[in-house]
Amino acid sequence: MPTLIQPYDPHWKTEFEQLKQVLSNELNDFEIDIQHVGSTAIPGLCAKPVLDVDIILHNKSMLEQLTVILERIGYVSKGEQGIEGRFAFRQRAVFTPITSTQQQWQAHHLYVCF
């Protein structure tokens, strides 16, 4: 079933901030920036209700270690998918990233970039 474009929802920003906090806590040993990108990041813009989240990894040699942690919290690595320097991860379930609260998360695309 196709994902339909919806009016802007301010909850998208809140959901991103919560995701960012969880990811920051899990990845605190890495030099990273986490950014909300794409149409859901632009206030007032209609969008598909799927967040786009970029993790900018400053040390490319740490990708394998970072991937292990992302997989541990429920993400599945999908590789570069034809875009060199950008690695895609998908949620294994609506509870990804896995936390002690078993929170159900907004659908999102997660990318690790250099």
Task: Identify the role of each PLM range.
Residues 1-48, 56-114:
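Catalytic core of pol beta-like nucleotidyltransferases
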